[in-house]
């Protein structure tokens, strides 16, 4: 804050990178929990810390990373080119280790690139952060999928350490009949397609999105920008119970998104061609409130029909676990299970961190320093 106040923007970026190699990205999308705890709140309002990060990034220009420590001769493979993997690669490279990032998609960034819409995070600004990370000497191998193009066993033979930071990039299912119908897509896949410029024309269509998190808000607002005639959010609890940021909810409402709250998905309606026509939802009521969050139960009323041409499911994310289980890596309830250090009991030199080990979290990068540890 003091450095920005003095106009020393490049120094501010250097300071931020000591703990977080994505200062520009955070200036756009960080959930700024630090502002909620800012002591200035005792006087009037918090300091706009996220905004100051963005000011520093906007005015600093290109700031080179610090010089790396002398080489240790150690080689580290990092599986996953998202924020966790790139953060680990950055700090490990600065320590003198040679890191190689394996990424299955064409470009680095993970959910930052393929999950967050461009209106929230311009991809050229994300590239500013990634470019600085790669300047440290991090090597990259794109288009390789673990278990298909290369195995954990092969990587263990080639590298001193293997770090798994694959994130949580697959979707959870509703568990309803006809969920495989045409016109139904997960929010993760929908946003990934948009991120890869595989644009879906939604002109004149009715779109329903199930879920109340930030991914849900990204999906509905993206659908609106793709020309949808009507976009609705279907959520089983209250607006107050949504995990999305208040600003994202307000933005969606301001753009004409309809909020269908206290409605739980019950069944999916399809036509003779097995294309989604709509969804039946069961009205809910609050049965109790604990720690500010409502528990719900059916009201006993008849199900309500919500017509839609496209149904987007945004109820959470999982990780791809099949190959890792085959490699002897413990997996439980959609997470890779590690010791507190990120290591495994019977796999020396193999570690895991980020969303795949802790469970899906916000991409405001609060966890990224853990990946380097």
Task: Give names to the regions the model predicted.
Residues 148-154, 273-301:
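Conserved beta-strand-loop-beta-strand element in the redox core of flavoprotein oxidoreductases
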Residues 3-6, 11-19, 42, 46-50, ...:
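Beta1-alpha1 glycine-rich phosphate/pyrophosphate-binding loop at the start
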Residues 74-81, 206-210:
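Beta1/beta-strand and adjacent pyrophosphate-binding region of the FAD-binding site
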């Amino acid at each position: 804050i003091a450095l920005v106040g003095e106009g020393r923007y490049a120094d501010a970026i250097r300071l931020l990178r000591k703990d977080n190699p994505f200062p520009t990205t955070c200036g756009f999308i960080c959930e700024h929990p630090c502002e909620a705890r800012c002591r200035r709140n005792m006087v009037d309002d918090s300091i706009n810390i996220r905004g100051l990060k963005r000011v520093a990034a906007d005015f600093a220009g290109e700031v080179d990373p610090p010089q790396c420590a002398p080489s240790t001769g150690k080689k580290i493979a990092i599986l996953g080119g998202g924020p966790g993997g790139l953060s680990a690669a950055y700090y490990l490279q600065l320590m003198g280790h040679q890191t190689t990032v394996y990424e299955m998609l064409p470009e680095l960034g993970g959910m930052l690139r393929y999950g967050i819409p461009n209106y929230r995070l311009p991809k050229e600004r994300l590239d500013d952060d990634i470019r600085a990370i790669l300047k440290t000497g991090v090597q990259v191998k794109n288009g390789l999928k673990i278990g298909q193009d290369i195995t954990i066993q092969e990587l263990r033979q080639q590298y001193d350490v293997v770090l798994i930071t694959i994130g949580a990039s697959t979707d959870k299912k509703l568990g309803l009949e006809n969920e495989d119908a045409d016109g139904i897509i997960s929010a993760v896949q929908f946003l990934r397609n948009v991120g890869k410029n595989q644009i879906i024309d939604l002109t004149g269509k009715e779109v329903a999105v199930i879920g109340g998190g930030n991914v849900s808000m990204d999906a509905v607002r993206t659908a609106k920008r793709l020309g949808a005639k009507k976009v609705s959010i279907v959520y089983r609890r209250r607006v107050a119970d949504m995990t999305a940021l208040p600003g994202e909810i307000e933005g969606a409402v301001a753009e004409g998104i309809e909020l269908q709250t206290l409605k739980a998905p019950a069944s999916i309606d399809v036509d003779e061609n097995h294309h989604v026509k709509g969804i039946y939802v069961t009205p809910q009521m609050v049965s109790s409130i604990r720690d500010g969050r409502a528990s719900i139960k059916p009201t006993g009323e008849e199900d309500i029909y919500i017509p839609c041409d496209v149904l987007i499911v945004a109820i959470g994310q999982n990780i791809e676990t099949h190959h890792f289980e085959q490699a002897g890596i413990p997996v439980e309830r959609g997470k890779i299970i590690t010791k507190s250090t990120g290591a495994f009991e019977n796999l020396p030199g193999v570690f895991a961190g980020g969303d795949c080990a802790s469970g899906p979290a916000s991409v405001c990068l609060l966890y990224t320093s853990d990946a380097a540890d």
